């Protein structure tokens, strides 16, 4: 078992990922440029990276082959990570996020619910370490904008203690809505 884990960690280190980071490839697209000799293809990859305990980021990489584009995206994602507060495997409160035409609502769920989400939003939640959440996306179904809208929503999350500190109150004095 540990041998398999070491192989996986070595693979992550070769790709430029730190040990302990989870990555999910959300989208790979192929672009064709027409040149005199025919078509020249290039690839773009969208990757979500997280540590499974509240850190998550996204990256977008382009190259002439798929593996280098994924590696570039992983490197960019590991540099753009944000912290997401987690409460018992879920999020502290309901929150909306938006990016372009994408609208995403994230709703906390009880233990055992699982991740109820589309493919792009699910990748972000899994990389972040969320186990129980309800989500709904509105507007576009473009995975790139859905990931950005999800991360916008996650950046707005605050714990009870953070809200109390902003208001200059004791966390016990806050009234649940």
Curated annotation (Swiss-Prot):
Alphabetically ordered keywords of this record: Ribonucleoprotein, Ribosomal protein, RNA-binding, rRNA-binding
SUPFAM superfamilies recorded: dsRNA-binding domain-like, Ribosomal protein S5 domain 2-like
Tagged with keyword Ribosomal protein: yes
GO annotation terms (biological process): translation
The S5 DRBM domain, residue ranges: 21-84
InterPro entries: Ribosomal_Su5_D2-typ_SF (IPR020568), Ribosomal_uS5 (IPR000851), Ribosomal_uS5_bac-type (IPR005712), Ribosomal_uS5_C (IPR005324), Ribosomal_uS5_N (IPR013810), Ribosomal_uS5_N_CS (IPR018192), Ribsml_uS5_D2-typ_fold_subgr (IPR014721)
Superkingdom, natural source: Bacteria
Gene Ontology CC, one term: cytosolic small ribosomal subunit
Molecular-function GO terms, alphabetical: rRNA binding; structural constituent of ribosome
Keyword Signal applies: no
Pfam families named in the record: Ribosomal_S5, Ribosomal_S5_C
Family membership noted in the UniProt record: Belongs to the universal ribosomal protein uS5 family.
Complexes and interactors: Part of the 30S ribosomal subunit. Contacts proteins S4 and S8.
HAMAP family in alphabetical order: Ribosomal_uS5_B
Function summary: With S4 and S12 plays an important role in translational accuracy. Located at the back of the 30S subunit body where it stabilizes the conformation of the head with respect to the body.
Domain text: The N-terminal domain interacts with the head of the 30S subunit; the C-terminal domain interacts with the body and contacts protein S4. The interaction surface between S4 and S5 is involved in control of translational fidelity.
NCBIfam families (alphabetical): rpsE_bact
Protein name per the record: Small ribosomal subunit protein uS5
Organism: Rhodopirellula baltica (strain DSM 10527 / NCIMB 13988 / SH1)
């Amino acid at each position: 078992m540990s041998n398999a884990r070491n192989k996986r960690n070595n693979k992550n280190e070769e790709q430029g990922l730190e040990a302990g980071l989870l990555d999910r490839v959300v989208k790979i697209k192929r672009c064709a440029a027409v040149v005199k000799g025919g078509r020249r293809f290039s690839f773009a990859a969208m990757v979500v990276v997280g540590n499974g305990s509240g850190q998550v980021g996204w990256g977008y990489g382009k190259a002439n082959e798929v593996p280098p584009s994924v590696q570039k995206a992983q490197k960019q994602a590991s540099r753009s990570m944000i912290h997401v507060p987690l409460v018992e495997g879920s999020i502290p409160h309901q929150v909306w996020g938006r990016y372009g035409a994408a609208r995403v609502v994230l709703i906390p769920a009880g233990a055992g619910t699982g991740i109820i989400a589309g493919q792009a939003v699910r990748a972000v939640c899994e990389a972040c370490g969320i186990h129980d959440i309800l989500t709904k996306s509105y507007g576009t179904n473009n995975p790139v904008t859905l990931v950005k809208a999800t991360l916008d929503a996650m950046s707005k999350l605050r714990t009870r203690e953070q809200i109390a500190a902003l208001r200059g109150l004791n966390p016990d004095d806050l009234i649940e809505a």
